[in-house]
Amino acid sequence: MMFCANLGQPLKPLARVASGGELSRIMLALKNLSAQKPGIPRSMVFDEIDTGISGRMAQVVAEKMSQIGDHHQVICVTHLPQIAAMADAQYLVCKYDENGATRTEVTHLSDAQRAQEIARMVGGAACESESSVRHAAVMLAEAKERKQVLRTAINK
């Protein structure tokens, strides 16, 4: 597949010239297009689609996945709070060592736990202060409002 991200540049092989963020956005665009076709599986998995993106672009990706999630099951592994906040449900995956073997634990997070986890995602393990958790709760509330706006706009 040939690709050009910059005006006036020649097309080059996608695998050679696209950054991690560009690859993430291209994958999201392709999955978004395929989601609109009949007969497409009802589940889509995005494994760290947030690689190479942040800030506003992370919010755009989160909103697009939310829109796909209106008609498909979306499973997303993410490290960005913007994407986690837009999810309808959030699970925390932890790996730990037990008797010389790696174990994985998956926990469905309650609303309060989501706020704590998003606060940690924003500021690191030591950043679970009351103000950080309040900020995360605001992020979750704003994400909920944004999803409503997106759903209303689509249904018009």
Where does each model-flagged region fall?
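Internal helix-turn-beta structural module
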Residues: M1, V17, M27-A29, A115-G124
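GG-anchored amphipathic helix commonly corresponding to the ABC/SMC/Rad50 NBD signature/C-loop
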Residues: M1-L7, E22-M44
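Flexible loop/turn segments at secondary-structure boundaries
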Residues: Q9-P10, A35, G52-I53, I83-A84
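Short pre-catalytic strand/loop immediately N-terminal to key active-site residues, enriched for Gly-Thr
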Residues: L11-V17
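Conserved D-loop-proximal element of ABC-family nucleotide-binding domains
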Residues: K12, P38-G39, T51-G55, Q59
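Charged, polyampholytic interaction/assembly segments that form long, compositionally biased interfaces
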Residues: V17-S24, L33-A35, Q148-A153
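Walker B catalytic acidic pair
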Residues: D47-E48
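C-terminal lobe/lid and adjacent interdomain/linker elements of RecA-like ASCE P-loop ATPase modules
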Residues: R56-K156
